[in-house]
């Protein structure tokens, strides 16, 4: 039995690269989709916010000298490409997914309309939110917090490269320990970078817990959803 009825899964664009330097790694996206399918079969309603960093990052080197808002819009379009790839892979795996974009691209994806998104979730479809919040200067982490609050998700699952929040960078400090759980205030006081400040504040204000876990660890998503000790829970 899932511990959560409805979740918001935040996937970074980089997670889709696998071991590649750029783009979408086919084996990686298939494995991720199979993990999502596993939790939908348990009765969990799943919405996804996808990043675009595997294709373009508004804050990265390729955007140097570019107007920040323009670069951010390009990043949003990258998330639409990722969302389409994710939805197509889900279809091939026998799932039904709907892509909803915060920026209107009607010929390609439907616009984000909250009641429609809620209807899809209740029907057991996976909803993939693309184009971030639709506004420059906001990260896809903030989009995850916003959409999570809007759809009434019980938790935001932040899928990353590391299996939780650590007391220090585990790559640099062998003595770093993983927190099983930590409060929002404690994470702020210890300056732990769970999400960017805007996303973090939104989750805290809405009393929306965050679970940070590794998407590269097989079965981790299932263990998180069934309430096992996996990753780090950030709570009020």
Swiss-Prot record:
Catalytic activity: UMP + ATP = UDP + ADP
EC number annotated for this UniProt entry: 2.7.4.22
A GO molecular-function annotation: UMP kinase activity
Stored InterPro entries: AceGlu_kinase-like_sf, Asp/Glu/Uridylate_kinase, Uridylate_kinase, Uridylate_kinase_bac
Positions of UMP binding: 52, 72, 133-140
Positions bound to ATP: 10-13, 53, 57, 160, 166, 169
Pathway: Pyrimidine metabolism; CTP biosynthesis via de novo pathway; UDP from UMP (UMPK route): step 1/1
Family: Belongs to the UMP kinase family.
Subunit field text: Homohexamer.
Name the record gives this protein: Uridylate kinase
Native source organism of the sequence: Methylibium petroleiphilum (strain ATCC BAA-1232 / LMG 22953 / PM1)
């Amino acid at each position: 039995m899932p511990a959560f009825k409805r979740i918001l899964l935040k996937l970074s664009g980089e997670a889709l690269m696998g071991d590649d330097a750029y783009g979408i790694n086919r084996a990686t996206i298939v494995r991720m989709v199979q993990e999502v399918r596993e939790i939908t079969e348990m009765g969990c309603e799943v919405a996804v916010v996808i990043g675009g960093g595997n294709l373009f990052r508004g804050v990265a080197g390729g955007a140097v000298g570019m107007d920040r808002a323009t670069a951010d819009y390009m990043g949003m379009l990258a998330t639409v490409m990722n969302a389409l790839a994710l939805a197509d892979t889900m279809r091939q795996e026998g799932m039904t997914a709907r892509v909803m974009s915060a920026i209107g691209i009607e010929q390609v994806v439907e616009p984000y309309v909250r009641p429609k998104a809620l209807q899809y979730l209740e029907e057991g479809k996976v909803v993939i939110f693309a184009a971030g919040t639709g506004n420059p200067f906001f990260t896809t982490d903030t989009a995850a917090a916003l959409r999570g609050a809007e759809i009434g998700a019980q938790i935001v699952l932040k899928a990353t490269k590391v299996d939780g929040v650590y007391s220090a960078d585990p790559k640099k400090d062998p003595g770093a320990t993983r927190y099983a759980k930590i409060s929002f205030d404690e994470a702020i006081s210890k300056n732990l970078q769970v999400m960017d400040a805007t996303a973090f504040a939104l989750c805290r204000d809405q009393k929306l817990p965050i679970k940070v876990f590794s998407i590269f660890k097989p079965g981790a998503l299932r263990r998180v959803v069934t309430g096992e000790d996996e990753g780090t829970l950030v709570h009020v």
